[in-house]
Amino acid sequence: MSKHLRITLVKSLIGVAEKHRRVVAGLGLRHTHHSVERLDTPEIRGMVNKVPYLLRWEELS
């Protein structure tokens, strides 16, 4: 079974750079406290690492 990440948007996007907004949208997050589960791939990890100050994430088995 492959690993998954649960990613939650914990900060508002007001005043955030447009590139960072696009990264958050690419993860599928729409509003504050919205969570999504994604496969743990290098691409998803890279997106999370671009905006760590906006997100909370945890590994799921």
From Swiss-Prot:
One of its GO terms (molecular function) is structural constituent of ribosome. Keywords: Ribonucleoprotein, Ribosomal protein. GO terms for cellular component: cytosolic large ribosomal subunit. CDD domains: Ribosomal_L30 (cd01658). InterPro entries: Ribo_uL30_ferredoxin-like_sf, Ribosomal_uL30_bac-type, Ribosomal_uL30_ferredoxin-like. Transmembrane segments: none annotated. The keyword Protease does not apply. One of its GO terms (biological process) is translation. It holds the Pfam family Ribosomal_L30. Part of the 50S ribosomal subunit. Belongs to the universal ribosomal protein uL30 family. This is Large ribosomal subunit protein uL30.
